């Protein structure tokens, strides 16, 4: 556990949630904050420099001098020799509008009240900073032992439907299963969904569920192997009809091996693809929208607040099957990998693989300067020439620059 131990005898400081869960599972947790039973803002003002405060939620960030008599830490040390630590006040919440952000009812509530607002019992464990004692009000230790995900009350998914997606994330990350009654509650909600919910939060959970398998993520500190659990997560996403949170339409799992495509063509660390036909730099082979490869198959993503780039990825997926190498190349030469893989899943896997395996590295050596040297004046005709040369090179990638110039010479008399 990457923590800071503060010398405090009040026994009011606790680690709560994922950090306790991860420690008990023997996993590293990089996102660590400390909860104070009471008002953390008032408490922290006594011993450190307050650098950020959110009074609405009772959270505070404090810069604490890294002196041995005050604290013992493995956290990053600041430039002035201090440690920055996040503290949270215990708080109780309610959901006056189901499916949307909760409202803070009380800051400085009891520890029991604070843990009762959590999603699953395994995330409702508390550990005393002072004594190291584990406090378990809801049976989280037993569920952790039995690898079960259990909600804290029957209204949990109604209050916050995104907990269903988080359950999927925890199930595949830790190899856990929904406890029987929790599974029943989930199934009931997915049959009677209230689509008046915060889709900004839905999108956030979808990204955190599918994205971490391919890119660095704070919860891991390093990328997991590509495709390590993405396929399992996707299968559960479809089989359990969790996709119903996004669209009421029925969806069948594609016959294409989605996990295999992602594993082969998406790298954990972004790296440039080969340049295009005229020297354009290709987009990276793995970007921040890999999650769209999975969610994009739903078709109707109108409820999700997509960025311009994310919407473009979807809009750029060809509606029809591309029939020639030239069409494949011209369509995908500047496309993102997510667009190409969505085309593979939805339209033509063979064509997409052919482009990625055989065509995308092909580039022209001839340039506009070469055409000027031949006496061809700059005009829209240049693009016609480049396209004809490209067609020839797609048929025979071994042709040289000299061969390309010979093809261009055919247009001297035009």
Annotated model-derived regions:
Residues 1-222, 229-270, 276-414:
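Catalytic cores of the polymerase beta-like nucleotidyltransferase superfamily
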């Amino acid at each position: 556990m990457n923590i800071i131990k503060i010398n405090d005898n009040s026994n009011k400081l606790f680690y709560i949630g994922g950090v306790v869960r991860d420690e008990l599972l023997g996993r590293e947790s990089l996102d660590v904050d400390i909860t104070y039973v009471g008002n953390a803002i008032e408490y922290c003002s006594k011993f450190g420099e307050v650098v950020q405060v959110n009074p609405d939620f009772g959270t505070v960030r404090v810069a604490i001098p890294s002196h041995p008599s005050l604290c013992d830490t493995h956290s990053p040390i600041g430039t002035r020799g201090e440690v920055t630590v996040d503290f949270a006040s215990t708080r109780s919440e309610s959901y006056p509008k189901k499916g949307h952000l909760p409202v803070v009812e009380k800051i400085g509530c009891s520890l029991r009240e604070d843990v009762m607002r959590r999603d699953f019992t395994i995330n409702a464990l508390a550990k005393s900073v002072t004594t190291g004692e584990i406090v378990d009000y809801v049976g989280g230790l037993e569920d952790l032992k039995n690898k079960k995900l259990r909600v804290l009350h029957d209204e949990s998914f109604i209050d916050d439907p995104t907990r269903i997606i988080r359950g999927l994330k925890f199930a595949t990350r830790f190899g856990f299963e929904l406890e029987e009654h929790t599974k029943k509650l989930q199934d009931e909600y997915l049959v009677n969904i209230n689509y008046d919910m915060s889709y900004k939060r839905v999108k956030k959970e979808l990204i955190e569920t599918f994205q971490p398998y391919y890119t660095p993520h704070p919860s891991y500190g390093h990328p997991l192997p590509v495709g390590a659990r993405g396929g399992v997560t996707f299968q559960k996403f479809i089989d359990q009809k969790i996709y119903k949170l996004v669209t009421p339409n029925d969806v069948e799992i594609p016959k294409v091996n989605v996990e295999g495509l992602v594993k082969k063509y998406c790298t954990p660390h972004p790296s440039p693809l080969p340049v295009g036909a005229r020297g354009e730099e290709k987009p990276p082979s793995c970007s921040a929208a890999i999650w769209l490869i999975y969610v994009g198959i739903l078709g109707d993503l109108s409820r999700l607040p997509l960025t311009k780039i994310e919407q473009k990825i979807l809009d750029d997926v060809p509606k029809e099957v591309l029939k020639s190498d030239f069409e494949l190349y011209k369509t995908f030469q500047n496309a993102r990998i997510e667009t190409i893989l969505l085309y593979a899943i939805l339209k033509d896997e063979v064509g997409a693989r052919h482009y990625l395996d055989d065509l995308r590295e092909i580039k022209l050596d001839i340039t506009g300067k070469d055409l000027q040297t031949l006496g061809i004046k700059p005009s829209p005709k240049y693009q016609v020439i480049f396209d004809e040369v490209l067609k020839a090179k797609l048929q025979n990638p071994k042709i040289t620059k000299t061969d390309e110039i010979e093809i261009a010479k055919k247009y001297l008399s035009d």
